[in-house]
């Protein structure tokens, strides 16, 4: 896949030299003239006759062997003839002294003087320098003028890059997993390659395909794979490339892009981050016209307007489909909206296999185990994981990548980089140990919480300590028990400090913030409040101009007060649960805290062993409870929701930093 270049001119046609070539030719001619003049000057001033030393010349004068002497007042050169007729030349000092002239006069030498003006060589040099400077200034100003004119005239031209399939860099084989997504995209590619197979049944090619999904899931990679396999011109452009400081530039670039695509039809246009120009239309902050709207209107007209584009497929990618204009999403423009979700376990394994291809792996590396331990990671996260593992192997001087490198890379991505320079006092380290121990103990004893993977009191990322949990499987639906246990685990650090020290620190700031947001979503969005019942008001997203700026509250002040009361009730109930559980397992909390103070980092298995030994019996003799089948929701069409940030990343409690 290479950027297309200009077509070669017909054989035998003469092409005018480019400005750079003309500049090089002029420089070569000027340099040749300068060298010629210098050589001419050198040879024109070469002395003639037998060269003599100045002392020898004075001796010959005193011996009356010199007949004539011509003195050059400019160069100090003396030429003439001896009494025997031999010509000579000598260079004397300037100015000539009276004693020297008296010596010549006493010897009866015929003396004459010359004061030559500037020679032809000097004149040529002066003219060459003058005209060289003039030509240089003229060329510079000409180029500046042409650049300004070209810049102004080309401001409305599209910045799309056109690719051919002579050397495809990315194919569908490089896109691991996502068989359903690749099937949807391959159908469009097959249509462009062989449209007759579809037109026999009256099928028409989709005009637009919108790739929707979280960041890093491979939407742009799919587009590059289409460019590598389509066999038709593929034009790639970013949504931000349409916008410029001049009014009307965005619409002009849209027109130019589609005109170029029509000339090369059938073709594919890919617009990355289309939400930068496709945002919902509405009144701006000052009531004025938005340049983005003009660009969007031109895009709508080109895709399916009075003069629709035929033989052109528009692909676009975004992770914000909720803010796109409805007119852009209707059938006839973007006929298909393909969701590119976070990869599941088999897809994560396939992605890891693709990114480890060509890398030297140690025998102990098990990619399936690593795929199970990375739920919620996108394809970009997994690529970064493999690269971090390779860098870790290089840092320790190994010749291959071991499983320990992958574990270290995963911890670095989820928990953050360890801060070697941060040194805690003994009192701070002990408080952090009990704080993280509270998280870890509750995560172990609760039935529905995610298992503990690792606990550390080493300053990592922005935190002073981290308790890392890894889900046992990919979750697509979250029961109420899981959400409540998540609230209890987050309360563990705060409650542990209260039980051990009798007071609080700033370490629980992130815990409280996350719990408050989660409890508010339970009440506002998921209908998990008996007092408010089955009502939902949506999340409090960022305000977008022209859409949410003038919206009023969706509920009354009384309802808002009820929401706050229910959020407070949920948080206090889960805090009481956390307090009761930690009082029951206080010996286990002390054992875990002492282990952290001794070794600084312990595994989830060691946390379970310490808690079981302190309790005198296994807390989970048959393993952790899972959600019974009978309690699963009966309606498959229930909308999936997520607990935090819309994804299923491994949880980590990194909230013991006072900065938070």
UniProtKB/Swiss-Prot annotation:
Gene Ontology biological process terms in this record: protein catabolic process; proteolysis
EC number: 3.4.24.-
Residues on Extracellular side: 46-118
UniProt cross-references to PROSITE patterns, sorted A to Z: AAA
Disordered, as annotated region: 1-20
Catalytic residue positions: 436
Any Gene Ontology CC annotation: plasma membrane
InterPro entries in the cross-refs: AAA+_ATPase, AAA_lid_3, ATPase_AAA_core, ATPase_AAA_CS, FtsH, P-loop_NTPase, Pept_M41_FtsH_extracell, Peptidase_M41
UniProt keyword Zinc present: yes
Positions on the Cytoplasmic side per record topology: 1-24, 140-660
EC class name: hydrolase
Membrane topology summary: Multi-pass membrane protein
Location, primary (coarse class): membrane
Binding residues for Zn(2+): 435, 439, 511
A single GO molecular function term of this UniProt record: ATP binding
Cofactor remark from the record: Binds 1 zinc ion per subunit.
CDD domains: RecA-like_FtsH (cd19501)
Cofactors demanded by this protein: Zn(2+)
Pfam family, one: AAA
Subcellular localization: Cell membrane
Entry keyword set: ATP-binding, Cell membrane, Hydrolase, Membrane, Metal-binding, Metalloprotease, Nucleotide-binding, Protease, Transmembrane, Transmembrane helix, Zinc
Biological role: Acts as a processive, ATP-dependent zinc metallopeptidase for both cytoplasmic and membrane proteins. Plays a role in the quality control of integral membrane proteins.
Subunit structure: Homohexamer.
The family this protein is said to belong to: In the central section; belongs to the AAA ATPase family. In the C-terminal section; belongs to the peptidase M41 family.
Protein name in the entry: ATP-dependent zinc metalloprotease FtsH
Organism: Acidimicrobium ferrooxidans (strain DSM 10331 / JCM 15462 / NBRC 103882 / ICP)
Source taxonomy: Bacteria, Bacillati, Actinomycetota, Acidimicrobiia, Acidimicrobiales
Gene, per the UniProt record: ftsH
């Amino acid at each position: 896949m290479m950027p297309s270049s200009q077509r070669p001119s017909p054989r035998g046609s003469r092409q005018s030299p480019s400005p750079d070539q003309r500049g090089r030719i002029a420089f070569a001619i000027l340099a040749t003239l300068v060298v010629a003049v210098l050589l001419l000057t050198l040879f024109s001033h070469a002395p003639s006759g037998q060269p003599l030393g100045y002392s020898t010349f004075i001796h010959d004068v005193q011996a009356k062997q010199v007949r004539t002497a011509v003195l050059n007042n400019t160069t100090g050169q003396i030429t003439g003839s001896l009494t025997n007729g031999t010509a000579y030349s000598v260079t004397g000092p300037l100015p000539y002294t009276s004693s020297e002239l008296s010596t010549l006069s006493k010897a009866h030498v015929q003396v004459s003087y010359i004061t030559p003006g500037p020679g032809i060589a000097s004149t040529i040099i002066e003219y060459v320098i003058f005209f060289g400077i003039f030509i240089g200034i003229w060329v510079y100003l000409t180029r500046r003028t042409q650049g300004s004119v070209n810049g102004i005239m080309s401001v409305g031209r599209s910045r799309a890059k056109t690719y051919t399939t002579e050397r495809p860099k990315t194919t569908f084989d490089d896109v691991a997993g996502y068989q359903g997504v690749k099937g949807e995209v391959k159908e469009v590619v097959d249509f462009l390659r062989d449209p007759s197979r579809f037109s026999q049944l009256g099928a028409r090619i989709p005009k637009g395909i919108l790739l929707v999904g979280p960041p890093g899931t491979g939407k742009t990679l799919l587009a590059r794979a289409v460019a590598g396999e389509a066999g038709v011109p593929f034009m790639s452009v970013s949504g931000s490339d349409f916008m410029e400081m001049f009014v009307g530039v965005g619409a002009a670039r849209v027109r130019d892009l589609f005109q170029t695509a029509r000339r090369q039809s059938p073709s594919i246009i890919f617009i990355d981050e289309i939400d930068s120009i496709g945002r919902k239309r509405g009144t701006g902050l000052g009531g004025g016209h938005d340049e983005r709207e003009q660009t969007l209107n031109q895009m709508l007209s080109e895709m399916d307007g009075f003069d629709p584009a035929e033989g052109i497929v528009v692909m676009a990618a975004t992770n914000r489909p909720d803010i796109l204009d409805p007119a852009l999403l209707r059938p006839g423009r973007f006929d298909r909206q393909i969701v590119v979700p976070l990869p599941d376990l088999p897809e994560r394994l396939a992605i890891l296999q693709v990114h480890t291809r060509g890398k030297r792996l140690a025998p102990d590396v098990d990619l399936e185990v690593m795929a199970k331990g990375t739920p919620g990671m996108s394809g970009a996260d997994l690529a970064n994981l493999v690269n971090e593992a390779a860098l870790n192997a290089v840092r320790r001087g190994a010749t291959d990548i071991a499983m320990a490198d992958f574990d270290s890379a995963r911890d670095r991505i989820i928990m953050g980089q360890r801060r070697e320079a941060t040194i805690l006092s003994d009192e701070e380290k002990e408080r952090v140990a009990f704080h993280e121990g509270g998280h870890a103990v509750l995560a172990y004893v609760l039935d529905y919480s995610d298992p503990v993977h690792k606990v550390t009191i080493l300053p990592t990322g922005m935190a002073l300590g981290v308790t890392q949990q890894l889900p046992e499987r990919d979750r697509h639906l979250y029961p109420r028990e899981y959400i409540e246990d998540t609230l209890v685990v987050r309360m563990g650090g705060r409650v542990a400090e209260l039980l051990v020290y009798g007071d609080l620190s700033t370490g629980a700031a992130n815990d409280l913030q996350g719990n408050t947001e989660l409890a508010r979503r339970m009440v506002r969005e998921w209908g998990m409040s008996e007092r408010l019942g089955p009502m939902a008001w949506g999340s409090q997203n960022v305000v977008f101009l022209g859409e949410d700026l003038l919206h009023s509250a969706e509920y009354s002040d009384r309802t808002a007060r009820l929401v706050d009361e229910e959020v407070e009730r949920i948080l206090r109930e889960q805090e009481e649960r956390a307090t009761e559980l930690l009082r029951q397992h206080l010996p286990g909390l002390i054992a875990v805290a002492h282990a952290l103070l001794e070794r600084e980092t312990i595994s989830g298995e060691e946390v379970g062993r310490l808690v079981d030994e302190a309790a005198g019996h296994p807390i989970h003799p048959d393993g952790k409870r899972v959600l019974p089948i009978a309690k699963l929701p009966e309606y498959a069409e229930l909308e999936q929701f997520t607990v935090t940030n819309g994804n299923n990343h491994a949880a980590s409690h990194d909230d013991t930093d006072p900065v938070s």
